[in-house]
A protein has these predicted regions:
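Functional transmembrane alpha-helices
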Residues: 1-138
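Cytoplasmic/organellar membrane-interface segments at the starts of transmembrane helices
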Residues: 60-62, 116-182
Length: 182
């Protein structure tokens, strides 16, 4: 996603740079949430290898729901902040070079496959041998873990529904971009 941000800046367009600001916010919030939740998974299972997990949804439904929401936000699903950033950058790239836009979109599709695969390996299916003995003792998220998750997810949704909350303050600065490219 940071590569997409660089492409948005390189487009030297109001749409591309504005999209970059939105994507940087969305990426920061969604990745912070994913890191926090990944740490919760590792602390609960004692396992770093996602291919040795599985089935955690049954034991930790809140953790799974937040992880899925963070993954979908990171993928740029509509209603999350990342969506508007990615859409704006891709639109600016289309105006610049449809080929570069297509390559960037392909990268986003590959990223989506990896994100959904990680979720499926950790939370879906049956518990693997590495975590099966302690599976019934794995706790769900605590209140202290849910609170920051709710705050980050709410921020992602708020900006997803109201992207102008971030971009409205940038209009004067972004409008100067066309004069920089002459």
């Amino acid at each position: 996603h940071m590569g997409l941000c660089f492409l948005g800046i390189a487009s030297m367009s109001v749409l591309g740079v504005g999209g970059t600001v939105l994507l940087m916010f969305g990426h920061g919030a969604s990745v912070a949430l994913l890191f926090m939740l990944s740490n919760a998974v590792v602390n609960r299972t004692g396992e770093w290898d996602m291919f040795k997990m599985g089935g955690l949804y049954k034991q930790t439904p809140n953790l799974a729901a937040f992880f899925l929401a963070a993954t979908l936000a990171s993928l740029g699903l509509p209603m999350f902040a990342n969506f508007w950033g990615e859409l704006s950058i891709l639109a600016s790239l289309w105006n610049f070079s449809p080929t570069i836009c297509a390559l960037a979109a392909t990268g986003l599709i590959i990223s989506a496959i990896y994100g959904l695969r990680a979720f499926a390996n950790v939370f879906m299916g049956e518990p693997k041998d590495a975590i099966a003995p302690k599976f019934s003792q794995i706790p769900d998220l605590t209140f202290a873990e849910k609170l920051p998750a709710v705050i980050l997810l709410a921020a992602l949704l708020f900006v997803g529904f109201c992207p102008k909350a971030i971009t409205s303050g940038l209009n004067a600065d972004l409008s100067a971009i066309p004069t920089l490219t002459k």
